[in-house]
Amino acid sequence: MTLACCKLDPHPQSPARQHTGPWLVWLHGLLGSGQDWLPVAELCGDYPSLLIDLPGHGNSVALTTTGFEDISRQISETLQANGIREYWLAGYSLGGRIAMYHACYGHKVGLQGLLVEGGNLGLESDELRKARFEQDCQWAQRFRHEPLPQVLADWYQQDVFADLDSQQREQLVAVRANNHGPAVADMLEATSLGHQPWLLPALQCLSVPYTYLCGERDHKFQQVAHQYKLPLRTLARAGHNAHRANPGAFAALVLSFLSQSSFLPLSSFLPPSR
């Protein structure tokens, strides 16, 4: 199954126009869509970009997934269907968790590196995972049965969004109210932290470069990054959704990471054409 997506060509003057990659592949958070990444992707225009709509979101609203292994496979099939052989994978929040899982356990041929924004590494015990799944199921029931603006008003009161002021919360509620509640609920349950493996050991064994991006006001994930010695890059004037709050600074950090991370394009290993 392939996911809905949007392709962005590199700038006309970009060297990337001369060959087939690498691409930047962007995964959004819960309640978002691939278009959330558009301001950042356009600022990273030396690279072609693929903005994916995850199951239950955007133009993939009618698609479902059974969990992390399944959605990793869907991403691989989407890349193949779009002719993408080399790529950097970037994800925010839920998208970051999916990106980490894919890099650790998925079919990652062609993966050049990983960029994670505010992604949770998982929970270390069965007890914690069980409690989190129960909590996510409660939210899912609300998304299924209550008016979406009412649920979203409570959703954005969670601690991870503490940096938002009332006007910013109202703006997010208005933007996200175009989601389909039951589809969001299905995705929330399928990708609950209660179902996610503890990813730190596998991350530490990655054979590709990776970085962890975080807004300076996102205290929860700043702490995660410091506690587990993740390769942290901090964005000024931003909280949990740093790429939305400060797309220019976010794009600059992405481009800095790409330029500092050496890689050999797949074409280097292919025989010359005759």
UniProtKB/Swiss-Prot annotation:
SUPFAM superfamilies: alpha/beta-Hydrolases (SSF53474). The keyword Phosphoprotein does not apply. One of its GO terms (biological process) is menaquinone biosynthetic process. InterPro entries: AB_hydrolase_1, AB_hydrolase_fold, SHCHC_synthase_MenH. Pathway: Quinol/quinone metabolism; 1,4-dihydroxy-2-naphthoate biosynthesis; 1,4-dihydroxy-2-naphthoate from chorismate: step 3/7; Quinol/quinone metabolism; menaquinone biosynthesis. It is an enzyme of class 4 (lyase). NCBIfam families: menH_SHCHC (TIGR03695), PRK11126.1 (NF008340). Belongs to the AB hydrolase superfamily. MenH family. Monomer. This is 2-succinyl-6-hydroxy-2,4-cyclohexadiene-1-carboxylate synthase. It comes from Yersinia enterocolitica serotype O:8 / biotype 1B (strain NCTC 13174 / 8081). The gene is menH.
